[in-house]
Amino acid sequence: MDAFKGGMSLERLPEGLRPPPPPPHDMGPSFHLARAADPREPLENSASESSDADLPDKERGGEAKGPEDGGAGSAGCGGGAEDPAKKKKQRRQRTHFTSQQLQELEATFQRNRYPDMSMREEIAVWTNLTEPRVRVWFKNRRAKWRKRERNQQLDLCKGGYVPQFSGLVQPYEDVYAAGYSYNNWAAKSLAPAPLSTKSFTFFNSMSPLSSQSMFSAPSSISSMTMPSSMGPGAVPGMPNSGLNNINNLTGSSLNSAMSPGACPYGTPASPYSVYRDTCNSSLASLRLKSKQHSSFGYGGLQGPASGLNACQYNS
């Protein structure tokens, strides 16, 4: 009765509020499977169709791409096979020359370093070579020759400059004898730059007092003095009448009196010929100052009646 009452109460409910009837037990799984299968069938079919439709395309694409890939691979292999052949063709083989060929080529190179086409062809005939080989050999040989010339010039510039400079300085020390005491200070003042004008400032800036103190030194005049026992006749090449005229000596006559014929200790010619005018002017100023300063020991130059030679002045 309760169930009947419950069923009647459910029937009295409106349709919107009624619960769905329970499905039967035997139809439940099949119903669920049918409902689950109904919407899935078109999806599976579509998926299968799409997969079936796509697979041939992919296979076809794979099959189509396979030959292309294979063709590309084969082309790559063919290119790889062709590249060494091209490299071998482009790369020239090293030519091995015989001694006879080298002798002929060297002899021709000594005569002419730039042979023309006809001469290269003749050389190729003589040496049993091709003209391009002969041309390349001459090109390489010229490059080697120029490199050797440059290296030789660099060696000469590096190692030959000091000997050349010393060669300019060294002869001035070897020309003079060791007995000349004035060579010491002269060589020291002239050795750095014998031909430059900077060395002349030593004489140009020399005052009369400094020149007097220099020439009054025993080392500079003692070598030029002569013994008092040697008379006028003992001087070779100087007559007695010439000795009487030495009273009127000037700077120029003093220079002529100191020639090798009049004085056994003649002044060397080459290096000091440049300084003679400067020395003469300094000697003239020395004579003028010696008259005022008699304490410097130049008594022989004070009086005009002095009959001594230029080499006989005593300090």
UniProtKB/Swiss-Prot annotation:
Expressed in primordial Rathke pouch, oral epithelium, first branchial arch, duodenum, and hindlimb. GO terms for molecular function: DNA-binding transcription activator activity, RNA polymerase II-specific; RNA polymerase II cis-regulatory region sequence-specific DNA binding; RNA polymerase II-specific DNA-binding transcription factor binding. The modification N-acetylmethionine is found at M1. It is found in: Nucleus. Residues 86-95 have a biased composition (Basic residues). It comes from Mus musculus. This is Pituitary homeobox 1. The modification Phosphoserine is found at S46, S48. Disulfide bonds: none annotated. The gene is Pitx1. Keywords: Acetylation, Activator, Developmental protein, DNA-binding, Homeobox, Nucleus, Phosphoprotein, Transcription, Transcription regulation. Interacts with POU1F1.
